[in-house]
């Protein structure tokens, strides 16, 4: 064994061994218990960042640990390769997105290998390959035929100068990022998938996910947003149509003083035909961002349409306002407004001098001032005619019954969740496999014509998608007639919503998924950032249920256990290029070696918390590995290792062996159950401290030390696999440590022959006793009283009481 630890040499040797022997190749075997560990695949941006390193190290540690538990482990890796950043980079670097993406994948794959991650590279997928997206296209055509995918008009960001659609990221302060023109909202026809059909199941099945963080489940529950309420309608004075609204607060219906409708609502548009100011307001509203965050903070504006809505219970006529905070694609595009009991409605009413009518009062003695703010709590009805005096639940039921009885409304369950809009007016994505016929109808591309391949030899002009104006792509013959391909591409969340399943059978050419998928699925452990808590994880859960209902998978949920790792910070903030506080993983690997980087990542913080990058901490991790190497070097040069004869162990040997097995017990629990890898590492460091203090070069002493070093090496091998690979060999083993069983706990080794007992006199520590673990209370009491320090203190005093706490202390009361 060489004396000095040389990480670069050791790591290259270990990685070559793993590659040449295909150590991490996963083969389905029904006789073995499987474990599918998956980390969220990266976007191939060009280089790994420290967030990637943390994510993938956590996943690799779990995978290697489970392999040592004897499980058949699948840990794949691939590339979330489509998306807008590739288009932008291609424009900047004057290249094609495909070329840029392919080069990035090659470089980043090399980085992942240098970090020693145990991936089955034979299962590698890139979502931009036709072999992958063919099956996404095929599945979408199935959804179209089942009616689960449909087209409707929806608003997009539109640049009138460039005549192109912009992603939300391309709108800066309401202007086009490229030309600075004011961005407008434009209604265009787009594809949607009916995720709302699965809303109830998506909500209820969260209760099955015991291995998910509660905060993630809470975020999904809120996003799905189940509510029970009353749907009813207002007649419109002088018109046949009615205004349908939904409310979760039927108890406040008697306080409606106006109805707000979307600026794109038919009533708004009709009124604007003869009202130039209203028409201008509607045009202004088109430029607004409709993201939830922006809608929450935008100044609430409105204009009277001149129409009146007739209150269904009182018959009172109330004004109908076009309002910029009501969205046409949310519900019916109309909301009842109760300014006395809703703060947004209150502020709007104050602004436009609309009536404020109190219909709910506090149940207790609370005094409210409706001149200052709305009273939004539940209470008791007032000013509500026959419903006066009713509390919320009774009022809900009574008013709902009144409406239902007269066929004016119905009790409904509503969801905040909207159907998933999957159309993107971008180039670098999966072509949507549909054909637009001359008669206006739309048909899915026949299966034998899939995949619809995305042309990759393109020039990006920064304005239009290269396939929009490319007749070679868009113009086709269908059933002997001229037709046009759809030139939109899929939202890239489509690719990431089923990739976990395709890893199970990446080479299948005649089916989206094979039976092998049911061997591996569901994923046993998923690792990724909490920023994906809603969209990616919700869409993946939805897609998995679609796959199940198509007979392609047997399970209800895709991910059994979820670990959401924290961010990597430097100088107190998240690492980012714009802040200039990034650390290049490549530089750290070259300076310290991959094992040091991995060890620092796992030791510096619990996985779900943010990690603060610290150069001193990295140095500390490096020092520990050199120390571990030095301990092994000392041991291998100390002499002959004898048989581990437990019956002959002396006190010091028993103590080190006890520490070894205490460490095995703690590390096993920390990794398996608690997933607190930092405390697991701390425990092994403590063991190494005890090994360094153990100076017994007898054959039996070296046998105890050998067991301790083997345990330390095995326990650390998932975290620092390269040095562990080498040390295992140096400790005399010819087998591959990757497949070596996890160390077995010897419960007998934990039993102590002797105990240290604290002796207190009048509550103060005065001495320590070493007693047999089997000593009874009388023996312990006698030894405590006989201890020289204690006996001296008790001279001339009367012992009133002796309290023995077994295994811990003796307290003597005397005066």
UniProtKB/Swiss-Prot annotation:
Its catalytic activity? tRNA(Leu) + L-leucine + ATP = L-leucyl-tRNA(Leu) + AMP + diphosphate
Q: Where is the signal peptide?
A: none
Q: Which InterPro entries match?
A: aa-tRNA-synth_I_CS, aa-tRNA-synth_Ia, Leu-tRNA-ligase, Leu_tRNA-synth_edit, M/V/L/I-tRNA-synth_anticd-bd, Methionyl/Leucyl_tRNA_Synth, Rossmann-like_a/b/a_fold, tRNAsynth_Ia_anticodon-bd
Amino acids binding ATP: 577
Which Gene3D superfamilies does this UniProt record tie to the protein?
3.10.20.590, HUPs, Isoleucyl-tRNA Synthetase, Domain 1
Listed A to Z, the keywords are:
Aminoacyl-tRNA synthetase, ATP-binding, Cytoplasm, Ligase, Nucleotide-binding, Protein biosynthesis
Q: Where is this motif: 'KMSKS' region?
A: 574-578
Query: Where's the motif 'HIGH' region?
Result: 42-52
Q: What is the predominant subcellular site recorded for this chain? A: cytoplasm
* Gene Ontology terms for molecular function: aminoacyl-tRNA deacylase activity; ATP binding; leucine-tRNA ligase activity
**EC numbers on record:** 6.1.1.4
Any one Gene Ontology BP term? leucyl-tRNA aminoacylation
PROSITE patterns of this UniProt entry? AA_TRNA_LIGASE_I
Report if keyword Phosphoprotein is assigned.
Answer: no
Keyword Protein biosynthesis in record: yes
Source species, domain of life: Bacteria
The places in or outside the cell where this protein is found are: Cytoplasm
Gene Ontology cellular component? cytosol
What does the sequence similarity comment in the record state about its family? Belongs to the class-I aminoacyl-tRNA synthetase family.
Output this protein's name: Leucine--tRNA ligase
Protein's organism: Marinomonas sp. (strain MWYL1)
Source lineage:
Bacteria, Pseudomonadati, Pseudomonadota, Gammaproteobacteria, Oceanospirillales
């Amino acid at each position: 064994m060489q004396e000095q630890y040389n990480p670069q040499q050791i790591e290259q040797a270990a990685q070559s061994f793993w590659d040449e022997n295909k150590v991490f190749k996963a083969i389905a075997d029904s006789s073995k218990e499987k474990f599918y560990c998956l980390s969220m695949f990266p976007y191939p941006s060009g280089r790994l960042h420290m967030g990637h390193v943390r994510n993938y190290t956590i996943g690799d540690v779990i995978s290697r640990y489970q392999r040592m538990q004897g499980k058949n482990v699948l840990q794949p890796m691939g590339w979330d390769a489509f998306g807008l950043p590739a288009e932008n980079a291609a424009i900047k670097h004057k290249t094609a997105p495909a070329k840029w993406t392919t080069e990035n994948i090659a470089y980043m794959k090399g980085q992942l290998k240098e970090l020693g991650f145990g991936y089955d590279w034979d299962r590698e997928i890139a979502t931009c390959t036709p072999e992958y997206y063919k099956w996404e296209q095929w599945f979408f055509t199935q959804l179209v035929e089942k009616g689960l995918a449909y087209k409707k008009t929806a608003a997009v960001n539109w640049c009138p100068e460039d005549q192109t659609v912009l992603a939300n990221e391309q709108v800066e302060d309401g202007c086009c990022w490229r030309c600075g023109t004011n961005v407008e909202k434009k209604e265009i026809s787009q594809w949607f998938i009916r995720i709302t059909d699965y809303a109830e199941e998506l909500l209820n099945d969260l209760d099955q996910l015991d291995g998910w963080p509660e905060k993630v489940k809470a975020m999904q529950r809120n996003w799905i947003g189940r509510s029970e309420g009353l749907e009813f309608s207002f007649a419109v004075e002088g018109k046949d149509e009615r205004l349908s609204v939904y409310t979760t607060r039927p108890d406040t219906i008697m306080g409606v003083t106006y109805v707000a409708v979307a600026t794109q609502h038919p009533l708004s548009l009709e009124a604007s035909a003869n009202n130039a100011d209203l028409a201008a307001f509607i045009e202004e509203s088109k430029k607004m961002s409709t993201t939830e965050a922006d809608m929450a903070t935008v100044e609430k504006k409105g204009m009277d349409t001149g129409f009146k809505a007739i209150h269904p219970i009182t018959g009172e006529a109330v004004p109908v306002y076009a309002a910029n905070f009501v969205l046409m694609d949310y519900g019916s595009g109309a909301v009842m407004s109760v300014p006395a009991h809703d703060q947004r409605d209150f502020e709007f009413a104050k602004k436009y001098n609309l009536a404020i009518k109190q219909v709910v009062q506090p149940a207790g003695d609370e005094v409210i001032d409706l001149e200052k703010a709305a009273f939004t709590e539940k209470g008791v009805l007032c000013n509500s005619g026959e419903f006066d005096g009713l509390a919320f639940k009774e009022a809900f039921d009574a008013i709902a019954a009144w409406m239902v009885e007269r066929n004016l409304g119905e009790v409904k369950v509503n969801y905040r969740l909207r159907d998933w809009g999957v159309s993107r007016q971008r180039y670098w994505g999966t072509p949507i496999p549909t054909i637009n016929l001359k008669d206006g109808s739309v048909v899915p591309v026949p299966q034998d014509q899939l995949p619809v391949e995305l042309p990759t030899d393109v020039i990006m002009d920064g304005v239009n998608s290269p396939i929009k104006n490319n007749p070679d792509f868009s113009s086709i013959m269908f059933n002997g007639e001229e037709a046009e391909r759809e030139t939109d591409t899929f939202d890239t969340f489509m690719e990431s919503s089923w990739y976990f399943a395709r890893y199970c059978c990446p080479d299948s050419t005649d089916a989206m998924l094979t039976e092998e998928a049911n061997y591996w699925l569901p994923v046993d452990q998923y690792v990724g950032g909490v920023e994906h808590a809603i969209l990616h994880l919700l869409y993946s859960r939805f897609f998995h249920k679609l796959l199940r209902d198509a007979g392609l998978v047997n399970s209800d949920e895709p991910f059994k256990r979820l670990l959401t790792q924290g961010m990597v910070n430097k100088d107190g903030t998240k690492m980012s290029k714009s802040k200039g506080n990034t650390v290049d993983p490549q530089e750290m690997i070259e300076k310290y070696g991959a094992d040091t980087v991995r060890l620092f990542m796992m030791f510096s913080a619990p996985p779900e918390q943010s990690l603060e990058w610290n150069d001193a901490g990295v140095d500390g991790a490096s020092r520990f590995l050199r120390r571990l190497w030095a301990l092994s070097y000392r041991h291998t040069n100390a002499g002959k290792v004898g048989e581990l004869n437990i019956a002959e162990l002396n006190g010091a040997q028993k103590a080190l062996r006890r520490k070894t097995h205490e460490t095995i017990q703690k590390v096993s629990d920390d990794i398996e159950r608690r997933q607190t890898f930092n405390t697991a590492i701390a425990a092994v460091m403590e063991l190494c401290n005890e090994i360094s203090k153990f100076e017994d070069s007898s054959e039996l002493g070296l046998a105890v030390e050998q067991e301790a070093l083997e345990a330390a090496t095995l326990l650390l091998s998932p975290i620092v696999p390269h040095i562990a690979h080498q040390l295992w060999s140096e400790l005399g083993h010819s087998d591959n440590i990757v497949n070596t069983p996890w160390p077995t706990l010897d419960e007998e080794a934990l039993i102590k022959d002797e105990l240290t007992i604290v002796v207190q006199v009048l509550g103060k520590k005065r001495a320590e006793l070493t007693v047999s673990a089997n000593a009874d209370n009388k023996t312990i009491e006698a030894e405590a009283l006989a201890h020289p320090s204690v006996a001296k203190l008790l001279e001339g005093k009367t012992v009133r009481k002796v309290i023995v706490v077994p295994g811990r202390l003796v307290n003597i009361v005397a005066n």
